[in-house]
């Protein structure tokens, strides 16, 4: 067989293959290719938009850290501050077994007394002069208002070495039973939180206390929801 005949046979075979490709299956295959192309194009466009507008991709490290710190319990955040600065820090919680009084615990999980802070006679003792953040939270609960108004008080007081008298630094009054009319409604439980906080210039040896007029209404259902603390700034 001559070379020209061989080339001619190859050309005829190619023409036959092209003719078969343009047969009944040709339009179907073209349609599939077109659909596949558009799907890939749409997917690429969607991915670009998501990356461009920040819907997906690496998260901001600072924002993630702030969110994580916001979820930390109070004592963990206080402990973090203490570790970084080595300044006086105190965070104590109430004794749930103390009947009829608000008694702060010195040795318990989630209690922190560091860098000179101490709890003496149910009072936090300041070890050095400076600015301090003072805070406290009480949570009250009751089964009913007993058909009469109820005024709950929460105070944080200071006794300084320079003058041996108690002075209120922070105070608040709340009533869970306002406008109660005798026999006007059925008994229903109530809950009332009171949070206090402020920054003060304190002196070495100052004694701080947190009290309430109705300790019998304190809610100890959850550990750590009644607390008292001081942080040096």
Swiss-Prot record:
Cellular component annotations (GO), alphabetically ordered: cell surface; extracellular space; plasma membrane
Keyword annotations from UniProtKB, A to Z: Cell membrane, Cytokine, Disulfide bond, Lipoprotein, Membrane, Myristate, Phosphoprotein, Secreted, Signal-anchor, Transmembrane, Transmembrane helix
GO BP terms, alphabetized: extrinsic apoptotic signaling pathway via death domain receptors; immune response; necroptotic signaling pathway; negative regulation of protein-containing complex disassembly; positive regulation of apoptotic process; positive regulation of canonical NF-kappaB signal transduction; positive regulation of extrinsic apoptotic signaling pathway; positive regulation of JUN kinase activity
Modifications after synthesis and translation: The soluble form derives from the membrane form by proteolytic processing. The membrane-bound form is further proteolytically processed by SPPL2A or SPPL2B through regulated intramembrane proteolysis producing TNF intracellular domains (ICD1 and ICD2) released in the cytosol and TNF C-domain 1 and C-domain 2 secreted into the extracellular space.
Entry keyword annotation includes Membrane: yes
Membrane-traversing stretches: 36-56
InterPro entries xrefs: TNF, TNF_alpha, TNF_CS, TNF_dom, Tumour_necrosis_fac-like_dom
Lipidation (N6-myristoyl lysine): 20
Phosphoserine: residues carrying this PTM: 2
Function: Cytokine that binds to TNFRSF1A/TNFR1 and TNFRSF1B/TNFBR. It is mainly secreted by macrophages and can induce cell death of certain tumor cell lines. It is potent pyrogen causing fever by direct action or by stimulation of interleukin-1 secretion and is implicated in the induction of cachexia, Under certain conditions it can stimulate cell proliferation and induce cell differentiation. Induces insulin resistance in adipocytes via inhibition of insulin-induced IRS1 tyrosine phosphorylation and insulin-induced glucose uptake.
Protein family membership: Belongs to the tumor necrosis factor family.
Protein name, entry field: Tumor necrosis factor
Protein species of origin: Notamacropus eugenii (Tammar wallaby)
Source organism phylogeny: Eukaryota, Metazoa, Chordata, Craniata, Vertebrata
């Amino acid at each position: 067989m001559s070379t020209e005949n061989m080339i001619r046979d190859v050309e005829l075979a190619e023409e036959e293959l092209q003719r078969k490709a343009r047969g009944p299956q040709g339009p179907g295959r073209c349609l599939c290719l077109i659909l596949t192309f558009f799907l890939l194009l749409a997917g690429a466009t969607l991915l670009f938009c998501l990356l461009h507008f920040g819907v997906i991709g690496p998260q901001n490290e600072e924002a993630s850290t702030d969110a994580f710190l916001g979820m930390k319990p109070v004592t963990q955040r206080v402990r973090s501050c203490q570790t970084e600065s080595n300044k006086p820090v105190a965070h104590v919680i109430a004794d749930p077994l103390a009947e009829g009084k608000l008694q702060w615990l010195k040795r318990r999980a989630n209690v922190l007394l560091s860098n000179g802070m101490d709890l003496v006679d149910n009072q936090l003792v300041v070890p050095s002069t400076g600015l301090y953040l003072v805070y406290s939270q009480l949570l009250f609960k009751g089964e009913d208002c007993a058909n009469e108004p109820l005024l709950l008080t929460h105070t944080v007081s200071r006794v300084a070495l320079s003058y041996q008298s108690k002075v209120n630094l922070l105070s608040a009054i709340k009533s869970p039973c306002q406008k109660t009319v005798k026999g006007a409604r059925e008994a229903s439980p109530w809950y009332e939180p009171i949070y206090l906080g402020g920054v003060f210039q304190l002196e070495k040896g100052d004694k701080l206390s947190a009290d309430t007029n109705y300790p019998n209404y304190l809610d100890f259902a959850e550990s750590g929801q009644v607390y008292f603390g001081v942080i040096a700034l």
